[in-house]
Amino acid sequence: MKIAIIGAGNMGGALARGLAQGSLVQTSDIYVSNPSTAKLEALKGEYPNINTTTSNCDAVATADVVVLAVKPWKVEQVLDEIKPHLDYSRQAVASMVGGLDIEQLSAWLEKGGALPATYLIMPNTAIAVMQSMTFIVSARSTAEQDCALVDIFNELGKAMLIEQSAMPAATSLASCGIAYAFRYIRAAMEGGVELGVRADDAKHIVMQTLRGAVEVLAASDAHPEAEIDRVTTPGGLTIRGLNAMEAAGFTHSVIEGLRASTKR
């Protein structure tokens, strides 16, 4: 599969690097375009076989999937530029741009009544280390196309095909959620420092504890509360800490944060 990425910024660059490190797309089948050359040169320095260009039209010419990774206000302009060069019978178009829906993307893509297989793709910033939780919404695509795209993004973490109506909640849990996880880490570090632990040590302790918690939950496939019950003992330190956190509104704050981040 040949993939063209329009835009070599944070998300576009991370996608290109992730694909180059994966096994499903040959590095020579990755095409990246960007208006300035500095980011392209950096990519080329890391992966010499990646194809780079300042021409969006050249980038999409032979691609099976064209991925838009540009600023929201540039999407319509970019589509107007590349649309005459796209063959909708064989090329799919995917957007990694936040705030767009299938209907708007389709309106910009339409030419002569024709539309391509179209995707919305929403990774989170962990795509840079190939640990993204990525959501994919599809329209006018085949099951084969869907499976191929999900497989590719599974190499960059975990990918899930969802309905467009589920995207706000999914984005809140994963794209916003990664910031909430960082905020918990920061809060735990501050607590550790108050208790006399050096900041760097506290950071490593909290990070490893979270890694362990995730691995335990993945291995057991149990409800989180079941694993909490395994840790707590009657009258013990853990249940005291949990009760203090709940009294301060821990669960309520998390839920309210998730709800707030679904509102535009």
Predicted features and spans:
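Rossmann-like NAD(P)(H) cofactor-binding subdomain of soluble oxidoreductases
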Residues: L15, T37, Y47, N56-I136
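NAD(P)+-binding Rossmann beta1-loop-alpha1 motif at the extreme N-terminus of oxidoreductases
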Residues: M1-T54, D58-A61, Q131, V193-L195
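Internal alpha-helical scaffold of NAD(P)-dependent oxidoreductase catalytic cores
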Residues: Q104-A117, M133-A169, Y180-A219, R264
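Short pre-catalytic strand/loop immediately N-terminal to key active-site residues, enriched for Gly-Thr
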Residues: Y119, M167-S172, P224-D229
